């Protein structure tokens, strides 16, 4: 059975104090703890990481196995990182892109995702619930294999 990876991109370490009107007051630790608890309860291995360095994120993606599942919030890399997109394509694992805020209702430059076309889905605008819903899907997908 594969592992679920949850990768958080740049500035997400500041959740809870960074623009709470857009991202809410829930901290990254609170989100991660909910995800860890849910996955452990289901008996599915999970690894959760956050980085502000694009190369580090890409290395984690490269280390994924063929039976793994990726939940990723690429942060600002969503809009321009073809390197992250290519990394996801190269490992060919099912991927869901998540965002706390509704990127389609924000500034024009945020409405474009270069990551979404290589994902099986995108969930945005539901705060921390975006991650929880993505995890529900990943758990179902892994237990049906």
From Swiss-Prot:
E.C. no: 4.2.1.10
Sorted UniProt keywords: Amino-acid biosynthesis, Aromatic amino acid biosynthesis, Lyase
Binding annotation for substrate: 73, 79, 86, 100-101, 110
A single GO molecular function term of this UniProt record: 3-dehydroquinate dehydratase activity
Gene3D superfamilies tied to this protein: Dehydroquinase, class II
A Pfam family this chain is assigned to: DHquinase_II
Keyword hit for Amino-acid biosynthesis: yes
Catalysed reaction, written as an equation: 3-dehydroquinate = 3-dehydroshikimate + H2O
Known pathway: Metabolic intermediate biosynthesis; chorismate biosynthesis; chorismate from D-erythrose 4-phosphate and phosphoenolpyruvate: step 3/7
Family indicated by similarity: Belongs to the type-II 3-dehydroquinase family.
Function: Catalyzes a trans-dehydration via an enolate intermediate.
Protein name per its UniProtKB record: 3-dehydroquinate dehydratase
């Amino acid at each position: 059975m594969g592992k679920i990876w949850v990768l958080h991109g740049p500035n997400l370490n500041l959740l809870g104090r960074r623009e709470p009107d857009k991202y809410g007051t829930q901290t990254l630790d609170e989100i991660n703890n909910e995800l860890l608890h849910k996955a452990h309860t289901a008996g599915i291995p999970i690894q959760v990481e956050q980085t502000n360095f694009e190369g580090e994120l890409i290395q984690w993606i490269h280390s994924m196995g063929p039976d793994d599942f990726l939940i990723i919030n690429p942060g600002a890399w969503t809009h321009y990182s073809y390197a992250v997109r290519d990394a996801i394509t190269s490992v060919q694992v099912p991927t869901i892109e998540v965002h706390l805020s509704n990127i389609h209702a924000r500034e024009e430059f945020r409405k474009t995702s270069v990551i979404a076309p290589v994902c099986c889905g995108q969930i945005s605008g539901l705060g921390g619930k975006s991650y929880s819903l993505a995890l529900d899907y990943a758990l179902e997908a892994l237990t049906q294999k």
